[in-house]
Amino acid sequence: DSEFELSKSYKPNKADWLDGTWTGFKTASFDARRGKTSSNEKDIKLIAKEIHSIPDEFTPHKRIKKIYNDRYQSIVNEKNIDWATAEALAFASLLADGYGVRLSGQDVGRGTFSHRHAVLYDQENEERFVPLRHFRKKQGLFEIVDSFLSEFGVLGFEYGYSQADPKTLVIWEAQFGDFSNGAQTIIDQFITTGERKWLRMS
């Protein structure tokens, strides 16, 4: 019973969740969690041109070249902007500001429904080119990783990555909705309860 009595006067040490690489961050208020995510039109159109430009010495598949041209024109014409184009612009806007973006999951480079095409392959020499990694001389690091089919392990790793590098947007994409079932323990025990239960942000 002595240990039980001692527990009544227990005071925890200071939480260290905002030390180290998290120095300078603070817990956001309810309203601040919505964030300011807008970009001005001029910047968006410049970024669109940069991320849809393929080097002359690179030979993409002709269909991929058409997709990239169509995406860029949708921005110029402000019409029929699809999900993949908007996603690429969002990622690029963060990268242009010096933040990192890391995307992992099964088949994320191409996109499960052949919609993303974030990784291109030269049709003559099979060299790999990632436009979001090379659109500016000074930009944040863009990583895109086709992970293996172990959702629990992969999401656990990505969650840890997000804690180690708070200035990188870390995204795990389940290939199909029910694939997230394999990672449900990580979702329940860490992602949705991390701040309250473990005093850890992500």
Indicate where each model-derived feature is located.
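Flexible, glycine-rich loop/tail regions that form catalytic "lids" or insertion modules at the edges
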Residues: D1-S202
